[in-house]
Amino acid sequence: SHYSEGPGQNLPFSVQNKXRLLGMM
């Protein structure tokens, strides 16, 4: 199930996480 998403979804997710951290700061 999760493998279906692939690393492609992980990449954007990481970027969003970084932006979230920056926004919080």
From Swiss-Prot:
Cellular localization per UniProt: Mitochondrion inner membrane
Keyword hit for Cell inner membrane: no
GO cellular component, one term: respiratory chain complex IV
GO term, biological process aspect, one: mitochondrial electron transport, cytochrome c to oxygen
Name of a matching Pfam family: COX7C
Membrane-topology descriptor: Single-pass membrane protein
Keyword Oxidoreductase listed: yes
Pathway field: Energy metabolism; oxidative phosphorylation
Main location: mitochondrion
Recorded GO MF terms: oxidoreductase activity
SUPFAM superfamilies in UniProt: Mitochondrial cytochrome c oxidase subunit VIIc (aka VIIIa)
Keywords: Membrane, Mitochondrion, Mitochondrion inner membrane, Oxidoreductase
Region (Disordered): 1-25
Oligomer status and interactors: Component of the cytochrome c oxidase (complex IV, CIV), a multisubunit enzyme composed of 14 subunits. The complex is composed of a catalytic core of 3 subunits MT-CO1, MT-CO2 and MT-CO3, encoded in the mitochondrial DNA, and 11 supernumerary subunits COX4I, COX5A, COX5B, COX6A, COX6B, COX6C, COX7A, COX7B, COX7C, COX8 and NDUFA4, which are encoded in the nuclear genome.
Family affiliation: Belongs to the cytochrome c oxidase VIIc family.
Function as written in the Swiss-Prot or TrEMBL entry: Component of the cytochrome c oxidase, the last enzyme in the mitochondrial electron transport chain which drives oxidative phosphorylation. The respiratory chain contains 3 multisubunit complexes succinate dehydrogenase (complex II, CII), ubiquinol-cytochrome c oxidoreductase (cytochrome b-c1 complex, complex III, CIII) and cytochrome c oxidase (complex IV, CIV), that cooperate to transfer electrons derived from NADH and succinate to molecular oxygen, creating an electrochemical gradient over the inner membrane that drives transmembrane transport and the ATP synthase.
Name assigned to this protein: Cytochrome c oxidase polypeptide VIIc
Taxonomic source organism: Oncorhynchus mykiss (Rainbow trout)
